[in-house]
Every structure is written in structure tokens, then in C-alpha cells.
Amino acid sequence: MSPSPIHSITFGRAAPGLAVRDIQAAFRFYSEILGMQKVFENGSPVGFMVLKKDAAEIHLSQSRDHAPSTVNAFHMFVDDIDALYAICEAAGVRIIKSLKDKDYGQRAFVFADPDGNRIDVGQRI
């Protein structure tokens, strides 16, 4: 059996896509809480938006009948997990799993956005 050509392909950064019921409300949340900036939007009215901060990117898609999942939508790394946790707590963000050191070498917590999308945030320790 010959090796698959997949082994010669290098993968880069992945950008998660999130369904949201109100794309403008989601934009306000991600910009105010996480400091993300809108770098692209499409549609009239807007139905798709790309948000970015540093190397992190989130793609939002309008879906009025979105039902939140019970699993994490994605994981992202930050360089000051304690500061982000404090920002989330002060803003009244719904914390799903509180901040703690994990046995897999990360300090992490999970929060939910206004649409119930669960975001896992970690920092390597």
C-alpha cells in the first residue's frame, strides 16, 4: 500500500465557525469581552462575519433557529488566562467550568456566549 498524499500536506491555523441567532449581538459580545475586531462581513442584512484578534479568528453565521450544543464549540489559547477569566466574571459571562489547572498541562475554563456556544480557553502551564 503506497503512502497517502495527505502526509505531504501541512495544515495551518483553523478558524471555527459558530452559528448565532443575532449576529450583531454576537459581534458586540466578542468585541467587548474578547476584544475581537470585525475584518469581514457579507450579506444584506449581514449573515456572515469574520472576527479576529491576534492569531485567533471566529466565523459567525446568522442562524435564527440555532440551538446550542452541550459540547465545546472550540478551544483557544491565550497568554493570560487569569486576566481573561477575571474579565469574563466581571462582565457576567456565563461560566460553564471554572478556572483550574488541568492534568493535561493547561490552566483552563469554559464559558458560553449569548447563544450558548461553549468556548474552552486555556493557557499552557
Question: Predicted regions span which residues?
Answer:
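Core segments of cupin and vicinal oxygen chelate
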Residues: 11, 17-57
